[in-house]
Design a protein with these regions (language model features):
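Conserved phosphate-binding elements of NTP-dependent enzyme cores
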Residues: 1-150
Length: 150
């Protein structure tokens, strides 16, 4: 069952519970709804519950970790993501940016290695490592926000 269908199933379950059962399940259902909503926001509504973890792409895995992190309410943590927008439709990239900003607004530091222009436009600060930045180290060629660098 895809995540988006599971969300719909839980929405229907909420309607079917009597008052007592709804009260008993309230905290769990709130957490489930929040996590499912976040999975959908970061473009993972298509994932099925039977999907094996080792079949996920790096970007999918990172976005699942983001969902877990938002649910844990951790603050003062450092998150480092390597191109989490790979393979995303621009609508989903916009939602991913919102989720990353939520993490930041909770008091965390979010570092993203990214080449997507939309992601860079929304960054608080960019450090351009220039050519040969991969395993060769590279060097800082520009810093600032998107408009300052371009």
């Amino acid at each position: 069952m895809p995540v988006k269908d599971l969300k719909a199933w839980f929405n229907e379950l909420d309607k079917k519970l009597n008052d007592h059962n709804r009260q008993v399940a309230k905290r769990i259902l709130i957490e489930l709804h929040n996590r499912l909503d976040t999975l959908i926001k970061v473009g993972l509504g298509y994932l099925t519950l039977s999907r094996l973890a080792n079949s996920l792409s790096g970007g999918e895995s990172q976005r699942i970790q983001l969902t877990r992190s938002l649910g844990s309410n951790l603050t003062n943590s450092l998150y480092i993501l390597d191109e989490p927008s790979i393979g995303l439709h621009s609508r989903d990239t916009t939602n991913l940016i919102k989720v990353l900003k939520e993490l930041r607004d909770l008091g965390n530091t979010v570092v993203v290695v990214e080449h997507d222009e939309m992601m860079m436009r929304e960054a608080d600060h960019i450090i351009d490592m220039g050519p040969l930045a991969s395993h060769l180290g590279g060097e800082v060629v520009a810093t600032g926000d998107y408009d300052e660098i371009i």
